[in-house]
Curated annotation (Swiss-Prot):
PANTHER family: POTASSIUM CHANNEL AKT1 (PTHR45743), POTASSIUM CHANNEL KAT3 (PTHR45743:SF27). GO terms for cellular component: monoatomic ion channel complex. Residues 522-593 form the KHA domain. Its main location: membrane. This is Potassium channel KAT6. Probable inward-rectifying potassium channel. Assuming opened or closed conformations in response to the voltage difference across the membrane, the channel is activated by hyperpolarization. Gene3D superfamilies: 1.10.287.70, Jelly Rolls. The segment S4 is probably the voltage-sensor and is characterized by a series of positively charged amino acids. The pore-forming region H5 is enclosed by the transmembrane segments S5 and S6 in the Shaker-type (1P/6TM) and contains the GYGD signature motif which seems to be involved in potassium selectivity. The KHA domain (rich in hydrophobic and acidic residues) present in the C-terminal part is likely to be important for tetramerization. Residues 222-241 dip into the membrane without crossing it. It is a multi-pass membrane protein. The keyword Transcription does not apply. A nucleoside 3',5'-cyclic phosphate binds at residues 350-470. Residues 55-64, 130-138, 195-221, 242-247 are extracellular.
Amino acid sequence: MAASRSELLRPAFGEPSPSLGPFVVNPHTCSYRWWQKFLIVLVLYTAWASPFELAMEKSASAALAVTELVVDAFFAVDIAVSFFVAYRDASTGLLVTDRKKIATRHLARPCLALDVASTIPLQMIYRIVSGKRQALYGLLNLLRLWRLRRVSKLFARLEKDIRFSYLWTRLIKLLYVTLFAVHFASCIYLWMAFHHKAKELTWIGSQFHGFEDRSVWFCYTCAVYWSITTLATVGYGDLHAANTGEMLFSIAFMLFNMGLTSYIIGNITNLVVHETTNTFKMRDMVQRTSVFGRTNRLPVAMREQMMESLQLRFRAEEQLQQEMLSELPKAVRSGIAQHMFRGAVQSCYLFQGVSDKLVLPLVAEMKAESFPPKADIILENEASTDCYIIVSGEVEVLTTLEDGTEKQVMRIGPRGMAGEIGVMFNIPQPFTIRSRKLTQLVRISHSHMVSTIRPNTADGVVVFSNFVLYLESLKVKAKETAFVRDHLRNGYSTVLGSATMFDVDESKESAHKMLPCKEPKRVSIHEHLLNGTGTALNGSSGKLVILPDSMQDLMKLSEKKFGKAARGILTVGGAEVEDIEVIRDGDHLFFSW
């Protein structure tokens, strides 16, 4: 992708998106980014060639001079292009696309002068004009190293790019800095030796007579050897400073090495600590859990469960996941939850056939959890605060017999539910739920489930109908297992006993009864229309009754109150009522005979 999401053109609040004018370059386009990457390659060449050319003047050739001119030309083009590149205002964070503002800002930058100076081939111009070399102009060529700031910006971007390893990016950066320091010091040592009047009074001349006639790579190898031994502070003594200038430079170089070494050691220490932080956290938590178990004399099996759950939590990084999600906007969290949990909800028996109006808010507050093998998810007789949808793995449903032993009732696999019986009936959990293998579940809280179903009456009917059918299937299974039937009859007769009172054909009516009821509507029913005084034509003032749930029940109520069957129901304005839902609290209803 050409630009990251956060780098797109962002308008001011309430204003239309900015558009790039003619001859204005978007700094986030793919072509401009590739141009910057190409310049990075040229910067790396400059970082090696400029000091080397300074030290090895005898290695200068026409090919090297042409290469330098071509490289300088590319950077000159970049300076010209930068007058047309939009920039992001630091105070507002908006992209400025006005060409006058871009040019004014670029001209006001102090680094423009250094950019231009580093592009001008001063030594070559002096040589063409005077016909000879000058050491001072050779040193001015080191202004090209100003381009190294591009490499620094590159590493700063790579460290923030999650596609690249932060550890390896930092290590490569440290290696690059070290190699450049060694190369630069080596070239300075050679430059000082070649330009000293008494060649034998130099660090290399005292060991190798006539070194100026040796090959370029021999001299460079000796310089790198001395530079790196100085950097590493080993100093074998075979090479050493032989004049005052070399001594002063060696002092400055060793002072620089002290700072560089501290920087490298500090960075590597920070990287190592960062990589092992989670391990230290886990070890500390495991140790505290172990001490807690021993102090409270918990059974060995319970301690093992605690350890397994703790280790699984760190491996799955559940805590980190929840912390990350909590920092996101609610709409983003909801979208993530839809992607992760919607399939599990729709495949579960309890929510089959419900609309998105129920699924969307239900999924928004779900949480994923993982349990190791043989971990207790729900305990028998505990409060019904949550139920679970099994995404992967398998759990077993257990009941405790009178002698205290546990007996398996059934196994539940993926797309099954656990703990919903206690939640639906609002009773203590009738069974113990224990994982048989590594199990991933989605947790739904009791309060959230009730608050989501309550306003969605039609979907609530579907949910309770599915639950009734599930209870009917439990009755069949319970007949095959006497101890389960006895257990439910003795302790929680409402669980399967409720299934008996729910006929499948009457599940909708039963579901209506189980749904939280709204405030009843009170209406006045009249046998005849009202006259001008507010009383019925036959003198009756009507009857105040509770509005039934259906039109049929309302008709039966009128027949019971007035002794005859009505053909229709009218409002005060004479409109015929066709749906019970349109009748409001306090309405006057009139029956047509």
